[in-house]
Amino acid sequence: MRSGFLQKWRIIMKWQEIPTPCYVVDEKKLKQNLKILQNLEQETGCHVLLAQKAFSMFSLYPLIGQYISGTTASGIFEARLGKEKMGKENHVFAPAYKEKDMEELVQICDHIIFNSFAQYEKYQHYFLQQECTASAGIRVNPECSTQEGHEIYDPCGPGSRLGVVKSEFPDQLPEYRIGI
């Protein structure tokens, strides 16, 4: 089933006639790649999520949504985009959240990842409400760098503030609804 948007704007052109700069998507190749991801989901039971930060061509979300489980966002605006344009699983992670955004995030997201236990505790009252269906998780910093010479950009490097390192984990995890 073709997206209405894609069908409406489907244009056949010679490559040499395409005005530049522009974004051109080869729908056949995209579908081939999406079928690989769909097979991965079927074979493993995992959920493949579109990282909107890497690819936010939302006109293709209906097509992409036919093959994968949903989207992942880095904040309120991407979370809204994923909810509105794909309408499937919607996950969000941000190093920090604003109080005014959390009320909407728990309504439009299925899973919200926090950067620390303190951050989760600040917002846990949203997850304890009976009507809340979103789940929460903690970002783990595995402290396992895979690169050398770029420590400043390494989210797992020494001094990174992204995620909880082993030494910051309590002996016993808190008894509220949270995942890792």
Model-derived regions, located:
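A short, N-terminal amphipathic alpha-helix
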Residues: N33-E43, L81
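Active-site-proximal beta-alpha core segment in soluble small-molecule metabolic enzymes
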Residues: C46-I180
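Generic N-terminal amphipathic, Lys/Arg-enriched alpha-helix
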Residues: I12-V24
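Short, Lys/Arg-enriched N-terminal segments with co-localized hydrophobic residues
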Residues: M1-I12
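Eukaryotic alpha-helical scaffold "rod" segments
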Residues: P19, T44-G45
